[in-house]
Amino acid sequence: RKDMKPEYDRIAVKAVVTLISNWRTHRGGLLHEGIVPSHAAYYFVGFWAWDTWRFSAALAKFDPELAKDNIRAMFDYQQPDGMIIDCIYTDPAENNARDSKPPLVSWAVDEIFTHTNDTAFISEMYPQLMAYYKWWYNKRDHNRNGMCEYGSTDGTLEAAAWESGMDNAIRFDDAKMLKNDGAEDAWSMDQESVDLNAYLALECKLLKKFAGILGVTFDGPDYSSQVADYFFDKEKGFFFDRRLKDGSFIQEPGCEAYTPLWTKVATADQVKAMLPLLTDTAKFSTYIPFPTVAADHPKYNPRGYWRGPIWLDQTYFAIRGLRNYGYNKMADEYTLQVFDRLQGLKEGAPIHENYGTHR
């Protein structure tokens, strides 16, 4: 943004440098080049699915060819049923196929298309994207109502939580695993997740766009119009996951509620109803805004990984989401809070995976 003060340019440069410094060429089981989450620890020298989608969306702005290859690297290991596995390494024996990750890949592909107008890449990816999109409804919709659940191929809750990307989120504390019909490797948590279905709604919208570009017919399921009302608790004024057994809301207010705003699934009235919670300094408008769970929650832990700290991707979803609904002044204020208050962000410190919400 040209209206930002020059002191914030360093943050933008740091973000680009962070991506470039984590760039790794193809080697061994990594058949295409891409970005690793961190070169500082050996166990992070691999490619993770939802990291790849976000890295590629960012790379699209300055190195779209690298962005394409990073996506191709994950699809090199697409399973026969369409699944994209969690993570891949130079040694394929280390790959994790117990779970997938949240589906943001069509968003990444669309970002690449926005900056390149490369219809050939859309044509290359479309069949694979459709196979992955359909996989969610084939293997992760326990009661076949069009609302999906996170799950695993081995029936473990551990891998199912990994599939959400939010490994130890409070909303999963009481979750149980259910075997899905039709395949031995299809298991779901006993709760439908709002973020997953909001992501799928965006994937659906973009896949329809790609189909239009290619002149083909979109033949996937479409439940996108149902997501907002299904997951919105009118009494609490917030989005929550829902239990499969009785449809009740899992009223653990967390960052998954930002996703319907970012994906533009929420209605304007729903976003307005959320504002009291989002702007409450005891809940989500913390010193560093938009934690992974409301800061006054009894289980909130400032060092609890997905049980308290802010993660920059989720904070971005919240701020971008507010902007999507016209709350530009509020979004600007929260953006500056992030830039000004994260220790070392404007100075020489590295960008961290997550941060505490308070001073």
Model-identified regions with their sequence ranges:
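Extended glycan-interaction surfaces of carbohydrate-active proteins
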Residues: D3-G46, D69-N95, N145-E192, S225-I310, ...
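Extended, well-ordered alpha-helical scaffold segments
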Residues: E7-K14, D63-D76, T119-Y137, E203, ...
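Hydrophobic residues within well-ordered, non-membrane alpha-helices that form the packing/core
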Residues: L19, L59, V109, C204, ...
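Aromatic-rich carbohydrate-recognition surfaces in CAZymes
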Residues: V45-A169, N197, I250, P309-A331, ...
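Proline-rich low-complexity regions
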Residues: P103, P127, F218-D219, P260, ...
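Short, intrinsically disordered, charge-balanced linker/junction segments flanking boundaries
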Residues: A198, A211-G215, R359
